[in-house]
Design a protein with these regions (language model features):
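Intrinsic-disorder/low-complexity detector
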Residues: 1-146
C-alpha cells in the first residue's frame, strides 16, 4: 500500500478536473468555511460552523454538508447585501461542487472521507484566498481614484 501511495501524485494547486469524492468534499468544506468567514469583521476571530463540525464532516460528509449549508443562509444573505460579487462567486462554487457530487454514486456520499479531502480543502482554500486578494487589490486601486 505504501508503494501505491508513493506512486500516486496529487497536485497541490486546485485541480478542477479531480472527481475523487473525498477531494470534492474537501473543496466543498473550504467553500462552506470561507463563505461564512467572508462575513466576519477583521476583529472577529470565532471559529466557523464548518471547522466546529470538522470531525463529523469527515465521518458523514453529505449529512453534515447539508446541515452546514442550511446554517449558511444568514451569512449568504449578508454577502448578497454587502459583497454581491463574492456572493455570486460562492454560489457558483456551490452549484459546481454539488453538481459534481450529484454525478457520483449516491450511496457513497455519506461514507467517511479518505485523507485526500485535505488536499481538496487546502487547494480550494488557497484558490479562494488568491482570488479574494486579487479582488481586494483591484477594489483598493479603484477606491483611491475616486
Amino acid at each position: 500500500r505504501n508503494d501505491q501511495a508513493k506512486r500516486e501524485e496529487w497536485k497541490v494547486t486546485l485541480d478542477t478536473e479531480n472527481r475523487d469524492r473525498s477531494y470534492l468534499f474537501g473543496r466543498l468544506l473550504a467553500v462552506l468555511e470561507q463563505a461564512e468567514a467572508a462575513t466576519y469583521g477583521k476583529e472577529d476571530r470565532r471559529e466557523t460552523n464548518a471547522l466546529r463540525r470538522l470531525t463529523r464532516y469527515t465521518q458523514q460528509p453529505m449529512h453534515t454538508a447539508r446541515a452546514l449549508y442550511e446554517k449558511l443562509n444568514p451569512y449568504l444573505n449578508r454577502l448578497m447585501r454587502n459583497k454581491p460579487g463574492l456572493y455570486r462567486q460562492y454560489r457558483a462554487l456551490f452549484d459546481q461542487l454539488f453538481g459534481l457530487l450529484d454525478e457520483l454514486e449516491h450511496t457513497s456520499l455519506n461514507e467517511p472521507l479518505e485523507d485526500v479531502y485535505l488536499l481538496g480543502y487546502s487547494s480550494q482554500r488557497s484558490a479562494l484566498f488568491t482570488k479574494q486578494e486579487q479582488n481586494e487589490t483591484n477594489t483598493d486601486g479603484g477606491n483611491t481614484d475616486e
